[in-house]
Curated annotation (Swiss-Prot):
Keyword Translocase belongs to the record: yes
Originating organism: Brettanomyces custersianus
Localisation per UniProt entry: Mitochondrion inner membrane
Name of the protein in question: Cytochrome c oxidase subunit 2
Keyword flag Magnesium: yes
Residues that coordinate or bind Cu cation A2: 217, 219, 221, 225
């Protein structure tokens, strides 16, 4: 597994002029990519069929002054242009329903991370870990200003306190907000959860490889909306437990 990871370079950050998705790191995101590819395939089939029919009509029926002289009714044609789109829509709908159910289903999570959006930073809480006083572990995460970035850090993406998660672990993310609507979104993990004041939304993730994943608030929340990035570090379980002990 490690040899495969070392021989591949994954795109887990936004890049200039990007034309496709970031590389997936969870089964949910892998399913979204597969659904997208299938939908694009069906759309290309429909585009090709419609283009062929238009070309055929323009070239065939222009040869006669009265092209519809012997065409009294077109029941077969009407049946086909009703049935084919319906079948294609069903082929798109059923996989999307299955994926939607899988993304919403949170099955026996090993740990829970709560994320609260505030203007304009994130606050995280590890509900399963407590200190000697019995308080849960929590911290605030702010974007690093451009003039304080170190070499290799990303502008408007790096934060002073990232989320650290163990790989190959079912993690439940519970998201809410304290003031206005925000959105917790990490593309490589297939996470996009609305943060609504007074409401808890949840979604699960199973990170299948180590890496650093970036996201940004995807709900317009005010003048500093672009200053609410999120950074997720997926590390081995031993490194995660060592990080917990340091907090």
């Amino acid at each position: 597994m490690k040899e495969m990871m070392m021989s591949n370079m994954f795109n887990d950050v936004p890049t200039p002029w990007a034309m496709f998705f970031q590389d997936s790191a969870t089964p949910n995101m892998e399913g979204m990519l597969e659904l997208h590819n299938n939908v694009v395939f069906y759309l290309c089939m429909m585009l090709g069929f419609v283009t062929f029919m238009l070309y055929n009509m323009l070239t065939t029926y222009n040869k006669s002054v009265m092209p519809y002289k012997y065409l009294n009714q077109g029941q077969f044609m009407e049946m086909m242009w009703t049935t084919l789109p319906a079948v294609m829509l069903l082929m798109i709908a059923f996989p999307s329903f299955i994926l939607l159910y899988m993304c919403d289903e949170v099955m026996a999570p090993a740990m829970t991370i709560k994320a609260m959006g505030l203007q304009w930073y994130w606050k995280y809480e590890y509900s399963d870990f407590m200190d000697e006083k019995g308080d849960t572990m929590e911290f605030e995460s702010y974007m690093i200003p451009e003039d304080l970035l170190d070499e290799g850090q990303l502008r408007q993406l790096d934060v002073d306190a990232p989320i650290v998660c163990p790989v190959d672990t079912h993690i439940r993310f519970m998201v809410t907000a304290a003031d206005v609507m925000h959105d917790f979104s990490v593309p490589s993990l297939g996470l996009k959860i609305d943060a609504v004041p007074g409401r808890l939304n949840q979604m699960s993730a199973l990170m299948q490889r180590e890496g650093v994943y970036y996201g940004q608030c995807s709900e317009l929340c005010g003048v500093m909306h672009s200053s609410m990035p999120m950074k997720v570090e997926a590390v081995p379980t031993a490194d995660f437990l060592a990080w917990i002990d340091e907090q």
